[in-house]
Amino acid sequence: MRVTVRLFARLRELAGASELVRDVPDGGTALDVWNGLAEEFPALAAYTKAISVAVNEDYARLTAIVHDGDDVAFLPPVSGGSGAANDGNE
């Protein structure tokens, strides 16, 4: 079966693409998709324990089973900001 993989931010930079199509065996999980990407793009492996995943635009666990035609998005950890809230009065 085939899934569309979407990568964001640093993950996109490391893979050199924001969208990929990959074959996954029947019964495969989001983690299987990720492991295939990490094998193809070894620099992604460093993010394995920190990524978030969404299947068909709903956050999911890496253990979620994916199906033919699914959209599987991987997002790196979010960081940044000044640490101070801006209430719009400045």
List the model feature ranges, each with a label:
Residues 5, 33, 69:
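Residue-level signal for inorganic ion chemistry
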Residues 17-48, 52-55:
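Compact, glycine-rich, soluble single-domain proteins
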Residues 57-89:
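C-terminal structural segments of small proteins and small subunits
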